């Protein structure tokens, strides 16, 4: 029979016989490894957010604005590098690039573990560290631009939904595990961590970083065995010009930025926000709920869009819901009612989950050409990731300027309303649909 490398060299996912006999198995192996690697990347990307709220109790002395800036840096770096990462699988090979981009993450993970144990670590050092953590956030673009190429068009939506949705769940995984890890003396002794006493408890902050070393090494080993380099068309500058000259690129970017930007931004800022507004609530133990809901509903959003044959409808309704929940979060802060505030935060994550899955399903339908749609997928994901930077930055800025949070929610709500209008204008009103616009 044909060797694995021969099969991969002549990849034909749209040929049913090839797909059943060879394609499906190899595609699924790549999807599983890619998804686990991406999940770990999201864990590392949000590693800082789980530690940030504890830093000052552990003997550091940072201002509120500094803390929000450090929380925003992984988003800034992750988003900016997504533009570059989108093209790397085509240039260096998907397997090679996944390996390189994952092994790099060992640097910030190990370094951060040592840095948080030393209270003389400077703000500048933490800026470098949080920037390196940001590399993890860029992996989403290369991962999403690559993995779809293994699958026939009829299964791309589901494959991208699994890769992106399960990958996003890394945020809830780290939010869920970090408090346990930080409280575990057993892990602390394995890693040789000196505990800090916070509110009378021994806390091992460094555990939250060191715990990712072994999983990263394991997935790197599995990659060498179960991933492949698909031969891909090399992107040329002409393709890029085609993308940027097209109004649909910008319309879809806005839609996805609104939904994913809200998701990643709230996920990064919520812990600090609750610490400021509801200091009496032990939030760390439930911080994972919102991101879990959003990540879990993302594949459902994609599936529902396939089912009713319209990503537009799912996106439009979700965005309207997002407007309502954003306004109501501010009301919850006003009433100082934590259960209401938390319920509205979760509702925000619900809307974001549906909208992110459905918007990504719109892209291959709006753009017929597979190369264009994979480049646009990468571009849209890159721009949207700035939400993870801008949202915490807005909160930090508004606190230092006004001393309360309302102006921040006003800005976010205005942005949501503009997005709903754009979605309506381009894809919802009479005679418009997402099919084959380009």
Functional labels for PLM-detected ranges:
Residues 48-53, 246-299, 356, 360, ...:
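Extracytoplasmic gate region of multi-pass secondary transporters
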Residues 81-94, 298-310:
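Helix-to-loop junctions at the C-terminal end of transmembrane segments
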Residues 91-102, 306-320:
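Cytoplasmic membrane-interface "Motif A"-like loop-to-helix N-cap segments
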Residues 103-119, 320-335:
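C-terminal ends and interior cores of transmembrane alpha-helices
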Residues 122-138, 339-354:
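Hydrophobic core of transmembrane alpha-helices in multi-pass small-molecule transporters
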Residues 137, 157-183, 381-391:
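Glycine-rich segments within core transmembrane alpha-helices of 12-TM secondary carriers
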Residues 183, 212-233, 420-427:
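C-terminal membrane-cytosol helix-exit motif in multi-pass small-molecule transporters
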Residues 311-359:
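C-terminal transmembrane helical hairpin of 12-TM major facilitator-type secondary transporters
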């Amino acid at each position: 029979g044909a060797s694995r490398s021969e099969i991969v060299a002549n990849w034909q996912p749209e040929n049913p016989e090839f797909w059943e006999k060879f394609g499906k198995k190899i595609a699924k192996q790549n999807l599983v490894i890619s998804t686990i690697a991406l999940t770990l990347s999201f864990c590392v990307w949000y590693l800082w957010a789980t530690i940030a709220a504890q830093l000052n109790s552990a003997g550091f002395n940072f201002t509120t604005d500094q803390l929000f800036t450090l929380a925003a840096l992984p988003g800034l770096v992750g988003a900016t590098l997504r533009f570059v990462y989108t093209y790397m699988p085509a240039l260096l090979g998907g397997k090679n690039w996944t390996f390189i981009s994952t092994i790099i993450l060992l640097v910030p993970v190990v370094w951060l573990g040592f840095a948080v144990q030393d209270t003389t670590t400077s703000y500048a050092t933490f800026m470098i560290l949080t920037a390196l953590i940001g590399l993890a956030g860029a992996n989403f673009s290369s991962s999403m631009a690559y993995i779809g190429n293994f699958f026939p068009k009829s299964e791309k939506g589901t494959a991208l939904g699994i890769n992106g949705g399960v990958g996003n769940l890394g945020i809830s995984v780290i939010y869920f595990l970090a408090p346990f890890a930080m409280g575990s003396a057993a892990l602390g002794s394995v890693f040789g961590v000196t505990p800090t006493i916070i509110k009378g408890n021994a806390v091992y902050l460094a555990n939250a970083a060191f715990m990712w070393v072994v999983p990263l090494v394991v997935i790197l080993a599995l990659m060498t065995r179960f991933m492949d380099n698909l031969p891909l068309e090399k992107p040329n500058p002409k393709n890029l010009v085609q993308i940027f000259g097209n109004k649909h690129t910008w319309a879809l970017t806005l839609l996805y930025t609104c939904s994913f930007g809200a998701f990643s931004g709230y996920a990064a800022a919520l812990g600090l926000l609750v610490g400021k507004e509801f200091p009496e609530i032990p939030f760390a133990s439930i911080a994972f709920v919102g991101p879990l809901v959003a990540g879990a509903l993302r594949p459902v959003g994609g599936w529902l869009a396939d089912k009713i044959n319209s990503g537009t409808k799912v996106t439009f309704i979700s965005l309207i819901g997002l407007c309502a929940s954003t306004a109501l979060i501010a009301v919850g802060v006003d009433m100082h009612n934590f259960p209401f505030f938390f319920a509205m935060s979760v509702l925000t994550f619900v809307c974001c989950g549906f909208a992110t899955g459905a918007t990504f399903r719109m892209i291959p339908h709006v753009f017929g050409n597979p190369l264009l749609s994979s480049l646009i997928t990468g571009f849209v994901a890159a721009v949207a990731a700035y939400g993870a930077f801008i949202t915490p930055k807005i909160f930090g800025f508004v606190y230092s300027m006004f001393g309360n949070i309302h102006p921040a929610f006003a800005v976010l709500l205005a942005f949501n309303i503009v997005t709903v209008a754009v979605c309506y204008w381009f894809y919802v009103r009479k005679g418009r649909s997402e099919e084959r616009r380009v």
